[in-house]
Amino acid sequence: MDKKFARIRRATRARRKLQELGATRLVVHRTPRHIYAQVIAPNGSEVLVAASTVEKAIAEQLKYTGNKDAAAAVGKAVAERALEKGIKDVSFDRSGFQYHGRVQALADAAREAGLQF
């Protein structure tokens, strides 16, 4: 089992549990160059809010899009957009990634901006 397959198995297990709860999810995906965050409806088929370092508005403020500062900017942006739509409570879906570094920075920034999880 390689590293990517193990991560996908962890993510699948966590998503199954969150689906049983029927919770709105804050999903994080990261690549070496970018980080993406989406708030997904409980049914799992609708993206309610999204933000990423690919967006010009966020990328222009940053020197580099693949670090913790960039992740914090995405976390703040996704939280502000979610609060505008009336979404306050979410479950954090880290997609099998360790809760460390950029994933943690995004989560902390989203909490500081007002999301609860």
UniProtKB/Swiss-Prot annotation:
<dbReference type="InterPro" id="IPR005484">
    <property type="entry name" value="Ribosomal_uL18_bac/euk"/>
</dbReference>
<dbReference type="GO" id="GO:0006412">
    <property type="term" value="P:translation"/>
</dbReference>
<comment type="similarity">
    <text>Belongs to the universal ribosomal protein uL18 family.</text>
</comment>
<protein>
    <recommendedName>
        <fullName>Large ribosomal subunit protein uL18</fullName>
    </recommendedName>
</protein>
<keyword id="KW-0699">rRNA-binding</keyword>
<dbReference type="InterPro" id="IPR004389">
    <property type="entry name" value="Ribosomal_uL18_bac-type"/>
</dbReference>
<dbReference type="GO" id="GO:0022625">
    <property type="term" value="C:cytosolic large ribosomal subunit"/>
</dbReference>
<keyword id="KW-0689">Ribosomal protein</keyword>
<comment type="function">
    <text>This is one of the proteins that bind and probably mediate the attachment of the 5S RNA into the large ribosomal subunit, where it forms part of the central protuberance.</text>
</comment>
<dbReference type="Pfam" id="PF00861">
    <property type="entry name" value="Ribosomal_L18p"/>
</dbReference>
<keyword id="KW-0694">RNA-binding</keyword>
<keyword id="KW-0687">Ribonucleoprotein</keyword>
<dbReference type="GO" id="GO:0008097">
    <property type="term" value="F:5S rRNA binding"/>
</dbReference>
<comment type="subunit">
    <text>Part of the 50S ribosomal subunit; part of the 5S rRNA/L5/L18/L25 subcomplex. Contacts the 5S and 23S rRNAs.</text>
</comment>
<dbReference type="GO" id="GO:0003735">
    <property type="term" value="F:structural constituent of ribosome"/>
</dbReference>
